Amino acid sequence: MISYEKSKTILKKAKIKIKDETIKSINSLNRVVSTNIYSNINYPAGNNAAFDGYAINSKDTNGLKKKFPKKFKIIGSIAAGMKPFKKKIKKFDTAEIMTGGIIPKGFDTIIPIEQIIFAPNKKYILIDQKIKKFDHVRFAGSDYRKGEVVIKKNTIVQPNHILAFK
């Protein structure tokens, strides 16, 4: 009989070569990646909302004071997965935006829904303070960028890796 220590040594020295294979990403969970996997997209594709709320241009809040709130006109709604918003953004415009919604050009900041004060007619929101630029924004490519290694060779595929296979 072989001792425990000797058997460990034999197993450590043994080399088993398993053939590489190409499989569908849906079948890759708990499999070992044989080469580095590179992203072929930026993810997220565009700047998007980190929270449900309202998109604004932070410059429109310069000089605002608690005693003198400014009305921002609600011009639409943006859901995650929607095509980019094409409306022309004017000064003091805002748009409702859901988490993951792409932020249209002209807006640069998200105010979370919990912080929103609506005008009585619900066609406007009221803002009474300076809002910092890029608050609650997830930037394009912040998870991973095109050409970046997203899964290293010899990594066991986990659920969070599968999105990178797009």
Task: State what each model feature region is.
Residues 1-66:
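Short, low-complexity N-terminal leaders and the immediately following helix N-cap/first helix
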Residues 58-166:
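Short, glycine/charged-enriched hinge/interface segments at domain edges or termini
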